[in-house]
């Protein structure tokens, strides 16, 4: 997945996944809804997030019955056994590359990391297609095999 898709698959990583899931690929995923909203408010919109955090959380609870702070990729990755490859553009101004480093540190499963210099949000493949493809091929060569259930 890319961006929100990356975050979705990383959050799913903490679930009991079926044995046919041999790996997870995440490109420029963020750590939580609250974390990305805070970053966007502060760095992109240049407004304080403070009280808006509580408002956003309340809106989430009312609309989807889940709080904006309830789930995070960091927590999910502490419980995964599925190999993960994390990719991020070093010059991403929408989702900070530090979030991928947080995810990488939290991940307890076998993991690979590719940071692409000069790439903005979701542009890693387009900046370095050969490097990206080689990293993905190497990842699947290592981990694309049946795994034991933990």
Model-predicted regions and their roles:
Residues 79-81, 86-88, 92:
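Short beta-strand/loop motif that positions the catalytic acidic residue
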Residues 127-150:
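Catalytic active-site module of serine/aspartate enzymes centered on a nucleophile-bearing elbow/loop
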Residues 1-9:
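Gly/Ala-rich beta-loop-alpha elbow adjacent to hydrolase catalytic centers
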Residues 60-76, 82:
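Active-site nucleophile elbow and catalytic-triad environment of alpha/beta-hydrolase enzymes
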Residues 104-123:
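Catalytic histidine neighborhood in serine/cysteine hydrolases
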Residues 11-66, 115:
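Hydrolase active-site cap/lid region
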Residues 73, 82, 96-105:
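Short alpha-helix in the alpha/beta-hydrolase fold that links the catalytic acid
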Residues 91-95, 122-123:
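Acidic catalytic loop of the alpha/beta-hydrolase fold
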């Amino acid at each position: 997945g890319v961006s929100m898709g990356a975050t979705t698959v990383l959050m799913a990583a903490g679930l009991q996944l079926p044995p046919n899931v041999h790996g997870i690929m995440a490109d420029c995923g963020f750590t939580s809804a609250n974390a990305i909203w805070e970053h966007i408010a502060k760095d992109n919109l240049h407004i304080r997030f403070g009280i808006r955090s509580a408002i956003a959380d309340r809106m989430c609870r009312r609309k989807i019955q889940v709080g904006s702070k309830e789930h995070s990729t960091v927590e999910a990755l502490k419980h995964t056994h599925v190999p993960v490859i994390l990719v991020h553009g070093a010059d991403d101004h929408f989702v900070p590359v530090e979030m991928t480093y947080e995810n990488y540190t939290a991940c307890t499963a076998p993991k690979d990391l590719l940071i692409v210099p000069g790439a903005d949000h979701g542009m890693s493949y387009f900046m370095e297609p050969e490097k990206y493809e080689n990293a993905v091929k190497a990842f699947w060569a290592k981990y694309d095999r049946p795994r034991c259930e933990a």
